Structures are given as structure tokens and as C-alpha cells.
């Protein structure tokens, strides 16, 4: 008879194989190379904000009713900004979800003027309409794809990034999205990532 520990071990091994295969299929790009692409967007998921979703009394204009960055999230935001600054990158505008954790991430990155944009809001728990949000974002993306400029920078939520890029992201993770080629690449902030 096989022990329960051995059964559990094999269960986890079998479950992890598809994830390792998917990770192996994911393509990466350095931040330096990502910043040299034109007509693209760099999406960043907001930095670490412990918890899940938002409280039931959520109001977009009241940070006290939202899940917010903790100290690690604030440090992570600054580290992301430092990676951009180490490459002498600055932009006129960083587009951000109106959620406080996204706005704070964008401000702490400190690489450009932060502009709140409803097309980056989270529709995870129905606080905003998914279709309306993605239509606003799609309209914004269509104006970006034809410009011959460095990537637009957008700070948003897992559900928004996944809806556009088909990739799941961790807190503070960046994705380069090539609008013309409908291609997504995970960004390595440093050579050690």
C-alpha cells in the first residue's frame, strides 16, 4: 500500500508539470530591450498589497475602503522605478488605474506624471463594468499602437493585464505587450531576475 505522503507527493508532481511547461514557454525580455521597442505598452501589476480583492464597502475615491500597499509594496514600487531610472528612462505620463494601490505604485515609481485612467480599473469583483473598462482600454491602446515612441507605461490589476495579454502576473510584475503582433513578454527588471 502506498503511503499518504507518497500519494500527496506524486499528486503535487503531476499538478506542477503543466505549470513548469507553461513557464518554459513564456518568453522574457529585459527592461532595457522593452524600453527600446516602439508602439508597445508596458503593463505593471500594482506592487504588493496584502489580501484579496477589496472590502465590501469599497469606494474608488476613498483609500480607507481599499486594499493598499504595505511597506514591502512601497519598497517594491521604488525598486521598479529605480530599474527604469538606472536606464535613464522617464516618460511624460504613467497611466494608472484609479485604485489607490495602483496610483501609489505609479507615484512611488517616480518616472513621470501619474494620470488616473478608468480603462485600467479592476472589474474583478464587479466594482466597474468589464466591457466598458476594456472598451476604454482598447480605444487607448489603438492610439498607442501607431506611435513611434517608447512604450506607454500602465499600472493596473491582474484581471486587466490577463484580459489583454493572456498572462497571469504577480504583484509588481511587468509585461511588454506588442499591440501589432498581439505578443506578450514578461519583463526582467535586472539581469538577476
Region annotations inferred by a language model:
Residues 10-19:
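Bacterial N-terminal signal peptides
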Residues 39-41, 150-156:
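Generic beta-sheet signal
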Residues 1-10:
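Bacterial N-terminal signal peptides that target proteins for export
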Residues 128-136:
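Short, surface-exposed amphipathic charged segments that create phosphate/polyanion-binding patches used
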Residues 26-118, 123-126, 167-185, 190-193:
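Active-site-proximal alpha-helix that buttresses catalytic centers in soluble enzyme cores
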Residues 20-24:
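Sec/Tat signal peptide C-region and signal peptidase I cleavage site
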Amino acid at each position: 500500500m502506498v503511503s499518504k505522503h507518497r500519494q500527496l507527493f506524486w499528486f503535487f508532481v503531476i499538478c506542477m508539470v503543466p505549470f513548469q511547461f507553461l513557464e518554459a514557454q513564456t518568453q522574457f525580455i529585459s527592461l532595457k530591450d522593452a524600453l527600446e521597442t516602439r508602439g508597445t505598452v508596458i503593463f505593471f501589476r500594482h506592487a504588493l498589497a496584502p489580501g484579496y480583492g477589496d472590502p465590501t464597502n469599497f469606494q474608488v475615491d476613498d483609500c480607507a475602503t481599499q486594499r493598499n500597499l504595505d511597506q514591502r509594496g512601497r519598497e517594491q514600487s521604488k525598486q521598479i522605478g529605480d530599474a527604469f531610472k538606472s536606464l535613464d528612462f522617464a516618460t511624460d505620463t504613467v497611466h494608472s488605474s484609479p485604485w489607490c494601490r495602483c496610483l501609489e505604485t505609479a507615484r512611488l515609481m517616480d518616472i513621470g506624471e501619474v494620470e488616473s485612467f478608468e480603462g485600467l480599473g479592476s472589474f474583478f469583483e464587479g466594482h466597474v463594468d468589464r466591457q466598458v473598462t476594456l472598451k476604454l482600454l482598447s480605444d487607448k491602446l489603438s492610439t498607442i499602437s501607431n506611435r513611434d515612441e517608447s512604450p506607454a507605461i500602465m499600472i493596473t490589476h491582474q484581471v486587466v493585464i490577463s484580459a489583454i495579454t493572456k498572462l497571469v502576473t504577480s504583484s509588481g510584475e511587468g509585461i511588454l505587450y506588442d499591440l501589432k503582433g498581439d505578443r506578450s513578454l514578461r519583463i526582467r527588471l535586472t539581469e538577476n531576475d
